Amino acid sequence: MYELTGDQKWLPLAEKYTEDLDSVQYLTWHHDVGFMIGSSYLNGYRFAGKEEYKPVIIQTAKSLSTRFRPAAGVLQSWDADKGWQAERGWKCPVIIDNMMNLELLFEASKLSGDSTFYNIARKHADTTMANHFREDNSCYHVVDYDPETGEVRKRQTAQGYADESARARGQAWA
């Protein structure tokens, strides 16, 4: 709301709800940390100049980077050995939603001077472009990779109508 209106009344609320997410910066078991912190701390840093948010952004990039699988060139979205994801037989599932994390990695690279974050984001984007899109430019929800060889194992959906259907939310993020 603050970005949209510029009305200062929104700042205290934005800061309160942002700072409630402080512990998220240390999570390494899923990819959502990038957009959770990007939509909160990164926006707080950009719009309100909150210098104290910089370390949180950088730490989140470090945590997210632990999900990078170099042989496949992607950030693994979900752990494949727990919950419903384990039932799918995936090894390194990557969802198109993961593209939302790249902004945080690019910004963390600028803020920290560490090009590792930039390189991970760029490689993930390039790999996604090569493997997530169909001839008609619609995208798969999930592409499962072999984390050791980088080969694509499966192209599926976890939330869409069918494996070969376009998922509106994923298309928007792509």
Where would I find each of the regions flagged by the language model?
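Glycan-recognition and catalytic cores of secretory/periplasmic carbohydrate-active enzymes
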Residues: 1-173
